[in-house]
Swiss-Prot record:
It comes from the Eukaryota. Coiled coil: none annotated. Component of the cytosolic iron-sulfur (Fe/S) protein assembly machinery. Required for maturation of extramitochondrial Fe/S proteins. GO terms for molecular function: 4 iron, 4 sulfur cluster binding; metal ion binding. Belongs to the NARF family. [4Fe-4S] cluster 1 binds at residues 23, 68, 71, 74. [4Fe-4S] cluster 2 binds at residues 187, 243, 395, 399. GO terms for biological process: iron-sulfur cluster assembly. The keyword Iron-sulfur applies. Keywords: 4Fe-4S, Iron, Iron-sulfur, Metal-binding. PANTHER family: NITRATE, FORMATE, IRON DEHYDROGENASE (PTHR11615). This is Probable cytosolic Fe-S cluster assembly factor GM20417.
Length: 477
């Protein structure tokens, strides 16, 4: 399977949300209105031709990430648009500038560089370089420190907090019978699709809990900034993620702090981009020094820095929330690993809890755009009301098979690679989100659990993106 395509692929075998090369953002052309009319043609060489006035060369289209988020023309991110702030080149540029400022003792312009590593890229890199997952994290710390990074963190604490917030949000909705079916929100490709394609119909059902990436952004730019006494605007926060759509998520205006004049996440690079950086350095990951990941949140470090959450590889939302709801709503303590029933395909599964012969909880996992489209259509036909929660991920097999994970290099089929990564994930230690470390974060920095401050910092909102029918859908830049 190729990593890139010129259009969104929606076939049974290959329905990744791959970045699109087709963008419909129009060029504004200033011209006086003709009284008699004229024929207009945009030619292949970018010339704008009007029969009465000759040719006018069009300027190159400059498209920002904000344009992508506000545009209703395509479903998700664009590959060839001018994304200058979300690339490994930009990261290297910032690191080099920072090193020069340190060398010249220009302390006013020195930034604190923080790198956050998600679990799925660590699995991908560990498999690529044939090393352990924890060692992959430690070697990456060595690599980024060699470039000038100050802190290299894992997303563990943010993953834990996301589950705590999402499970409580579900229980509150269930008890109030409000906006069910609840749909997970950690996948930016799915959220972008929901905003642009279904808008206000679907958005009330989407969980308001921020994704682990954006929770990590809050922790770094507010809590870590306070702990190390550095203004948030002087921290450059980079995340390593398994999909390109995380770049769009980081660029949402909702995640820009006017008070701090900075984004929660400044730059997102992906697994495949890290591989490219290592390839350009002509040095495999295993040859970099081993450094333990940093843990600035408390004096007590966790035993491991890379953890699994339940059985599923996309954060464990469906399984964890199902267990929590069963216990706290129906007093059912489900201690064994849950088994989801496969429906039409391996990427659509469900699980049911019954009491006295009655279904009281019904959850599902829907991965891949084929299943997402079916899911939304069922909801529109009011046939989905018996699902209480659905974990939704845009990529088949979920985040472990994200569109920016390292692809097979030896003729290996993508599904075989996914199976190998799943094995690595299942061998990781399991994290229980409600632990002393997350309690410390809530009590010391968020005024406790379910407070106004915790809601403000850990939740977000979504926006109906209205289609502009004046834009032609057949303009390819």
């Amino acid at each position: 399977m190729s990593r890139w395509s010129t259009a969104l692929q929606l076939t049974d075998i290959d329905d990744f949300i791959t970045p699109s090369q087709i963008c419909i953002k129009p060029v504004q052309i200033d011209k006086a209105r003709s009284k008699t009319g004229a024929k207009i043609k945009i030619k292949g060489d970018s010339c704008f031709e009007e029969s009465e006035s000759g040719n006018l060369k069009l300027n190159k289209v400059d498209i920002s990430l904000q344009d992508c988020l506000a545009c209703s023309g395509c479903i998700t991110s664009a590959e060839e648009v001018l994304i200058t702030q979300q690339s490994q080149e930009e990261l290297l540029k910032i690191l080099q500038e920072n090193s020069k400022n340190k060398a010249s003792e220009d302390w006013d312009n020195v930034r604190t560089i923080v790198i956050t590593l998600a679990t799925q890229p660590l699995l991908s890199l560990a498999h690529r370089y044939q090393i352990g997952v924890e060692d992959a994290a430690r070697h990456l710390n060595g690599y980024f420190r060699s470039l000038g990074a100050d802190y290299v963190l894992s997303t563990k604490v943010a993953d834990d907090i996301a589950l705590l917030e999402c499970r409580q949000e579900f229980v509150d909705r269930y008890r109030e019978n409000e906006n069910l079916t609840m749909l997970s929100s950690s996948c930016p490709g799915w959220v972008c699709y929901a905003e642009k394609t279904h808008g206000n119909f679907i958005l009330p059902y989407v969980s308001t809990t921020r994704s682990p990436q954006q929770i990590m952004g809050v922790l770094v730019k507010q809590i870590l900034a306070d702990k190390i006494n550095v203004p948030a605007s002087r921290i450059y926060h980079v995340t390593v993620m398994p999909c390109y759509d995380k770049k769009l998520e980081a660029s949402r205006e909702d995640f820009f702090s006017k008070a701090n004049n900075s984004r929660d996440v400044d730059c997102v690079i992906t697994s495949v981009e890290v591989e490219q950086l290592l390839s350009e350095a002509q040095r495999p990951l295993s040859q970099y020094d081993l450094f333990d990941l940093d843990w600035p949140w408390s004096n007590v470090r966790p035993e491991f820095m890379v953890w699994a959450h339940e059985k599923t590889q996309s954060g464990g939302y469906a399984e964890h929330i199902f267990k929590f709801a069963a216990k706290h709503i129906f007093n059912e303590d489900l201690t064994t690993e849950l088994e989801f029933k496969q429906l039409k395909n391996r990427d659509f599964r469900e699980i049911i809890l019954k009491q006295n012969g009655k279904t009281v909880l019904k959850f599902a996992i829907a991965n891949g755009f084929r299943n997402i489209q079916n899911l939304v259509q069922k909801l529109k036909r009011e046939k989905l009301s018996n699902y209480h929660f659905v974990e939704v991920m845009a990529c088949p097999s979920g985040c472990i098979n994200g569109g920016a994970q390292i692809r097979p290099t030896t003729g290996q089929h993508v599904r075989e690679l996914t199976r190998k990564l799943e094995e690595l994930y299942h061998n990781l230690p399991r994290s229980e989100p409600e632990n002393s470390l997350t309690k410390h974060i809530y009590n010391d920095f968020l005024d406790g659990f379910q407070t106004d401050k915790s809601y403000e910092m850990l939740h977000t909102r979504y926006h109906d993106v209205v289609s502009d029918l004046s834009i032609s859908l057949n303009i390819n830049w």
